[in-house]
A protein has these predicted regions:
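Residues at the starts of beta-strands that form the adenosine-phosphate
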Residues: 40, 60-61, 86, 134, ...
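C-terminal lobe and adjacent flexible extensions of AdoMet/dcAdoMet transferase-like proteins
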Residues: 195-200
Length: 200
């Protein structure tokens, strides 16, 4: 979520490989959203909207929040081009200030491993969720063969994430691996998990 880095990446972000992976992620998230037409979705680290904008026909609204203005510019272009009346973007950097936001469902897709203070961000998102709201996190499974530190990534094990979520106030935590892909993370094979949790 470091703005400058992702500002530089914005125009080259929507590669065929990234689009394909986002469609796989979107399909998995959609399975978690039955009967959600009255729900407001916030995607934290929404980027160019590859995942969040797949959900606009299933929910009341989608708000893409990101700390990269260039990424959000790309997302806004898609929203305008597709005439999506229930989608919008908002610039925000939760590491500096949490904006006044509310949502029934919060999505984080391939964002968690970029966050250094995971516990702090998950606590902030807990306050954004309405009572009964759900947090859906998709990210890479921890693999000791990854050279995380070289690229400044922080990948958590399922147990580590469960503990952080629980301490932040979330309950009904369920984490499951759903996809194994070739060369999907730093040109290495990797698997993806979906973590679901609830704010009671």
């Amino acid at each position: 979520m470091e703005g400058n880095t992702f500002d530089e990446m914005a125009k080259q972000y929507d590669t065929p490989e990234q689009i394909e992976l986002s469609e796989i992620i979107g399909k998995q998230i959609k399975q978690e959203l039955p009967d959600s037409r009255s729900k407001d979705v916030l995607e934290y680290g929404g980027g160019t909207g590859l995942v969040g904008l797949q959900l606009t026909d299933m929910v009341r609204s989608v708000k893409l929040v990101d700390s990269s203005r260039q990424m959000l510019d790309m997302a806004q272009e898609k929203i305008s081009r597709r005439s999506l009346s229930n989608a919008e973007v908002q610039y925000a950097d939760f590491t500096k200030e949490t904006p006044e936001l509310e949502a029934d469902i919060i999505i984080m897709s391939l964002v968690l491993h970029h966050i250094h203070d995971t516990a702090s961000i998950l606590r902030e998102l807990f306050h954004v969720l309405r009572p009964g709201g759900r947090l859906l996190i998709v990210d890479f499974d921890k693999d000791d063969t990854f050279d995380q530190h070289e690229h400044n990534h922080k990948i958590l094990s399922h147990d580590e994430l469960k503990e952080i979520l629980s301490e932040a106030g979330y309950s009904s935590i369920h984490i499951q691996t759903f996809y194994h892909g070739k060369s999907v993370f730093m040109n290495q094979d990797a698997s993806l998990f979906l973590a679901c949790s609830v704010k009671e």
